[in-house]
């Protein structure tokens, strides 16, 4: 079994509480901490149970697993699951991303080199170009592709047979997938944010692999501030380890974890400066909302896509922000978190002020 990886095109953000990998070095550390079997995978119980059945059935029949679509916020384990699926099937994994596949020939080169029942993992699959997506359809349905040979009047199309394979597509934006592409996935799984208890198990496992002494309370303190995201939990664990080595005795205790996370500006709810800036902007500059995403982005100096994909989902999931047809609204929990008295409208009157368009 082999794993091959193409470099991803999009530069990742460097925010410590981002669910995206911060650097190639971090990706290497993540690979070392990544579970290799479903039995080692923590969380996503329903998805794990489904995959155990589907993978076992595919192995019993000696056929390719149905194509899999994994979607959800960044850092929840989509890439990890793709590696686990390939490992459980005992096949090779070829990994790439949507932006890398610029031309049909780029995808054709990958597909024609796959062996029987191999797994092709495409991250950011919603960013595939339409021309590349077109040649993917017959590959997914019939294991065939049409490619053009030559140019101009002499050009001709030839049909190539492919080995049966499994495509695993991952995306943070399932709504941006075209209907024809979405309909070709036989297995669709949404990954949810993790509970603090699940993240505490991940922190314990990672601390063991990193050989970092960590007591139960110290590990849980990291877990509960990790925004429900394993990648963030592992990142914070490494930063707290640094603090423990320099400012402590090398062991992560509750006190060490608390002091390190305060230094990193991560509060008990798992919010950082950017989260608080967003909530403060909605409350102080836009009277609590509703306010459009473009106005928020301009106000806090952040990209609209980063707010939508990285910052906003956790705030909404935790009940600090509401997304409405007229814009974003700060909830009573947001006012309380910032120590601000909510206006009378929030307490019982009309919550929705003048509309600010998206």
Curated annotation (Swiss-Prot):
Catalytic reactions on record: ATP + H2O = ADP + phosphate + H(+)
Region Small ATPAse domain (RuvB-S), residue ranges: 195-265
One Pfam family of this chain: RuvB_C
Start and end residues of each stretch annotated as Head domain (RuvB-H): 268-358
Ligand binding (Mg(2+)): 79
UniProt key word DNA-binding: yes
Region of interest (Large ATPase domain (RuvB-L)), residue spans: 5-194
One GO-annotated biological process of the protein: DNA recombination
Chief localisation class: cytoplasm
Enzyme Commission designation: 3.6.4.-
Residues binding DNA, per UniProt: 304, 323, 328
Note on domains (UniProt): Has 3 domains, the large (RuvB-L) and small ATPase (RuvB-S) domains and the C-terminal head (RuvB-H) domain. The head domain binds DNA, while the ATPase domains jointly bind ATP, ADP or are empty depending on the state of the subunit in the translocation cycle. During a single DNA translocation step the structure of each domain remains the same, but their relative positions change.
Functional summary from the UniProt entry: The RuvA-RuvB-RuvC complex processes Holliday junction (HJ) DNA during genetic recombination and DNA repair, while the RuvA-RuvB complex plays an important role in the rescue of blocked DNA replication forks via replication fork reversal (RFR). RuvA specifically binds to HJ cruciform DNA, conferring on it an open structure. The RuvB hexamer acts as an ATP-dependent pump, pulling dsDNA into and through the RuvAB complex. RuvB forms 2 homohexamers on either side of HJ DNA bound by 1 or 2 RuvA tetramers; 4 subunits per hexamer contact DNA at a time.
Subunit structure: Homohexamer. Forms an RuvA(8)-RuvB(12)-Holliday junction (HJ) complex. HJ DNA is sandwiched between 2 RuvA tetramers; dsDNA enters through RuvA and exits via RuvB. An RuvB hexamer assembles on each DNA strand where it exits the tetramer. Each RuvB hexamer is contacted by two RuvA subunits (via domain III) on 2 adjacent RuvB subunits; this complex drives branch migration. In the full resolvosome a probable DNA-RuvA(4)-RuvB(12)-RuvC(2) complex forms which resolves the HJ.
Protein name: Holliday junction branch migration complex subunit RuvB
This protein's encoding gene: ruvB
């Amino acid at each position: 079994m082999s794993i091959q990886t193409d470099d991803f095109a999009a530069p990742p953000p460097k925010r410590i509480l981002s669910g995206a990998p911060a650097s190639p070095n971090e990706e290497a550390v993540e690979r070392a901490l990544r579970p290799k079997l479903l039995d080692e995978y923590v969380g996503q119980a329903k998805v794990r149970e489904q995959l155990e059945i589907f993978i076992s059935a595919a192995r019993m029949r000696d056929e390719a697993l149905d194509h899999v679509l994994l979607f959800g916020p960044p850092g929840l384990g989509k890439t990890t699951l793709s590696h686990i699926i390939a490992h459980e099937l005992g096949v090779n994994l070829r990994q790439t991303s949507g932006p890398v596949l610029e031309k049909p020939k780029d995808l054709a080169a990958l597909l024609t080199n796959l062996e029987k029942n191999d797994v092709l993992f495409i991250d950011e699959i919603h960013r595939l170009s339409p021309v590349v997506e077109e040649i993917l359809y017959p590959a997914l349905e019939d294991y065939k592709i049409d490619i053009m040979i030559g140019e101009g009047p002499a050009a001709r199309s030839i049909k190539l047979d492919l080995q049966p394979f499994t495509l695993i597509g991952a995306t943070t934006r399932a709504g941006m997938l075209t209907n024809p592409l979405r309909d070709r996935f036989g297995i669709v799984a949404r990954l949810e944010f993790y509970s603090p208890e699940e993240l505490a198990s991940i922190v314990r496992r990672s601390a063991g692999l990193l050989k970092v002494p960590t007591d139960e309370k110290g590990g849980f303190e990291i877990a509960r501030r990790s925004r429900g995201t394993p990648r963030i939990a592992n990142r914070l664990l490494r930063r707290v380890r640094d603090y423990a080595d320099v400012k402590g005795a090398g062991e992560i205790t509750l006190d060490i974890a608390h002091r390190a996370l305060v230094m990193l500006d991560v509060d008990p709810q798992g919010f950082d400066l950017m989260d608080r800036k967003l909530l403060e902007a909605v409350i102080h500059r836009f009277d609590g909302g509703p306010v459009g995403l473009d106005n928020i982005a301009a106000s806090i100096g952040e990209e609209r896509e980063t707010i939508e994909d990285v910052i906003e989902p956790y705030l909404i999931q935790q009940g600090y922000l509401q997304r409405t047809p007229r814009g974003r609204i700060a909830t009573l929990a947001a006012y309380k978190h910032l120590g601000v008295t909510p206006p009378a409208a929030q307490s019982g009157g009309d919550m929705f002020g003048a509309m600010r368009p998206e």
